[in-house]
Curated annotation (Swiss-Prot):
One BP annotation, GO: mismatch repair
Keywords assigned: DNA damage, DNA repair
Name this protein carries in UniProt: DNA mismatch repair protein MutL
Coiled coil, from the record: none
Residue numbers spanned by region Disordered: 382-447
Family note: Belongs to the DNA mismatch repair MutL/HexB family.
Keyword DNA damage in annotation: yes
Pfam family, one: MutL_C
Length: 664
């Protein structure tokens, strides 16, 4: 058989088989063109499920007369020009195949007028002939594309179209996905002359939630958690639902990469893995998630319909999504939190007797239910739509009540501001050189009221502001107490029944990490690596890994032996996921080999956990008040009644007696 170059019209029809699968495929390509043109309003008219008519009208930038015919040619586009453009695609379309493919299997009319032209022009082409006819017409600034009699010249393709109702349902679902990707664009959908959907442009959070409710339903909105995270150039934001919002089918799963609709296996696996302990096998998560990253780090030129992408750092993307969602779900209010004793943000419900000369303690008494609301406040993330509710909690500017009923001077303005910002819905940033920190609680109406009551105190004369040390100040401290202020950027001043004390935040970081790594009580949960790490080691290190394999497993570190000089790291606990495992694991095995004969290593895992904590704990040069509160709160939850209060490098009492004497 002779090899020949295919005629252009035949090549276009073959390409149409990839691009134009059904009427919904046509709508997708044309609406994406409208979005790329900068349109803020798109009207879509459908007749007979799209088989008879598809009309897309927008108010975008338009096409000049001289380029109308070229726009209907194959591989003609204004979106990329060089190979560098192909490697950093931000537009939705880029191949230049859609209009040519659609026009080869339909009767297509392209009408457009840019702002630089007074006259609009229309280009018409039909089927295999591919001859473009231009004529002047009336049209506002923007573009209209009419696709009539889809597959009229390919009866076999037309025969495989489903019923009118089914084909329109595909178009409707497609536009739901598009509506969630561009909240600032108004979209109207008509079928057989009747308005079916009307998505008004959303310019604020409230309007965005209305569109979200329109697309996903009120049940989704009631159970949703708002996610906003950023790490190493990756950004993740959107909404997920708590396990209570799980569905029996996967009909509310929307994911976007750089604004592009995706059905990517890597992303789906990360999301499923984050829900694996929360959902039953027959349940499906519901979510609307947006992933943003450097366009050079993702290849969208993989699938003809652009439904899949290839990430250059697949493991990083997978683990980032998994960690973000798993942490959010673990700390949502749908999961019972550990009982919190006296802590940096918890206030005793029982009123103390006020010393003589101060205002009565009952003036600040708060019902037990109020404290319960604060105690059970979830740690992350913020419920969407509660930004407005947080505004009344401004009395932090005034002083707040100590447990003796006396006022304590407020923290400096910059620290109060940082504390308030940490409770706002701003993006929670995780940098590569510090441990992952979770956001603050998402208060309900009851919780907001509780905070307002706790933080509000009457305006008493300044002479009542005192901080009396207890006569038994030399006795051991029994609690970390309530946070007052950060001192010298590295220490936290707190108050307890015994008086005031300073906590070393660097030392607290170490103990927090140690608490996360200590598997004496219960084995730590191992988080599998997307790509297992293969290490070539000395024979003695591999032997140490085999000898202490059970101990490493209790700490969440899973090995798979390959041979006597190589092994694979299959999983690590959460505190180690962001570490350089290629350096850390060999050092850990060297430590285990050198300490194998010591009794402390043979009896428990504490020594190994301490060794790891010293190397993993990320100590900062300065801390904000919100960061300090987060550290000691997690420290109390991890250690509970076994707080290392005997460590003088962690906490020490502060006696203000001499200072107070100078002021009296």
């Amino acid at each position: 058989m002779t090899i020949r170059i295919l005629p252009a019209r035949l090549a276009n029809q073959i390409a149409a088989g990839e691009v134009v699968e059904r009427p919904a495929s046509v709508v997708k390509e044309l609406v994406e063109n409208s979005l790329d043109s900068g349109a803020t309003k798109i009207d879509i008219d459908i007749e007979k499920g799209g088989a008879k008519l598809i009309r897309i009208r927008d108010n975008g930038s338009g096409i000049v007369k001289d380029e109308l015919g070229l726009a209907l040619s194959r591989h003609a586009t204004s979106k990329i020009h060089t190979l560098d453009d192909l490697e950093a695609i931000m537009s939705l379309g880029f191949r230049g195949e859609a209009l040519a493919s659609i026009s080869s299997v339909s009767r297509l009319t392209l009408t457009s007028r840019p702002a630089t032209q007074e006259q609009a022009w229309s280009a018409y082409t039909e089927g295999r002939d591919m001859q473009v006819k231009l004529q002047p017409t009336a049209h506002p600034i923007g573009t209209t594309v009419e696709v009539v009699d889809l597959f009229f010249n390919t009866p076999a393709r037309r025969k495989f179209l489903r019923t009118e109702k089914t084909e329109f349902a595909h178009i409707d679902e497609l536009l739901k996905r598009i509506a969630l990707s561009c909240f600032d664009v108004s979209i109207t959908l008509r079928h057989n002359g009747k308005v079916i959907r009307q998505y008004r442009a959303a310019h604020n959070d409230l309007q965005a939630e209305k569109r979200l409710a329109t697309v996903c339903g009120q049940a989704f909105v009631r159970c949703m958690l708002k996610i906003e995270l950023e790490h190493q150039g990756l950004k993740l934001h959107g909404w997920i639902t708590t396990p209570e919002g799980a569905r029996q089918q996967s009909d509310l799963q929307y994911c976007y990469v750089n604004g592009r609709m995706m059905r990517d296996k890597l992303i789906n696996h990360a999301i499923r893995q984050s829900y694996e302990t929360s959902l039953k096998p027959e349940q499906f998560a519901a979510y609307v998630l947006f992933i943003e990253l450097d366009p050079h780090q993702v290849d969208v030129n993989v699938h003809p319909a652009k439904h899949e992408v290839r990430f250059h750092q697949a493991r990083l993307v997978h683990d980032f999504i998994y960690q973000a969602l798993a942490s959010a779900l673990a700390q949502s209010d749908s999961i019972e939190q550990p009982q919190i004793n006296e802590s940096a943000f918890h206030y005793q419900a029982e009123p103390e007797v006020a010393p003589q000369g101060s205002f009565p303690a009952e003036s600040n008494e708060v019902p037990q239910a109020v404290y319960h609301a604060i105690e059970k406040a979830p740690a992350y993330p913020r419920k969407a739509g509660q930004e407005q509710q947080l505004q009344p909690v401004a009395p932090l500017e005034s002083s707040f009540s100590s447990e003796q009923g006396r006022e304590v001077s407020p923290a400096p303005h910059n620290e109060r501001k940082a504390w308030m910002e940490s409770r706002s819905p701003a993006r929670h940033t995780t940098s590569s050189n510090q441990s992952e920190r979770y956001g603050e609680p998402a208060p309900s109406k009851q919780q907001v009221k509780a905070y307002a009551e706790l933080l509000h105190t009457p305006d008493f004369p300044s002479q009542n502001v005192e901080c009396h040390p207890s006569p038994s100040i030399a006795s051991p401290v029994q609690e970390l107490g309530k946070a007052v202020s950060v001192v010298a950027q590295r220490y936290l001043l707190t108050t307890t029944k015994a008086g005031c004390q300073l906590i070393s935040l660097a030392r607290a970081e170490f103990y927090r990490t140690l608490g996360q790594l200590n598997g004496d009580k219960a084995p730590l949960k191992s988080q599998p690596l997307l790509v297992p790490l293969s290490l070539k080691l000395e024979k003695g290190l591999v032997h140490a890994a085999q000898e202490h394999q059970d101990r490493f497993a209790r700490m969440g570190i899973l090995f798979k032996m390959r041979n006597e000089k190589a092994l694979m790291v299959m999983g690590v606990p959460a505190p180690l996921r962001q570490q350089n495992l290629q350096l850390l694991i060999p050092d850990l095995l060297s430590y285990a080999a050198s300490q194998a004969q010591k009794e402390e290593l043979a009896q428990n895992d504490t020594a190994m956990a301490q060794w790891l904590a010293l190397r993993v704990a990320k100590v900062k040069s300065h801390y904000t008040l919100s960061e300090a509160i987060q550290i000691i709160s997690e420290l109390e939850q991890l250690w509970q009644e076994k707080l290392p209060l005997q460590d003088s490098q962690l906490v020490t009492s502060v006696d203000f007696s001499a200072t107070i004497a100078q002021l009296t």
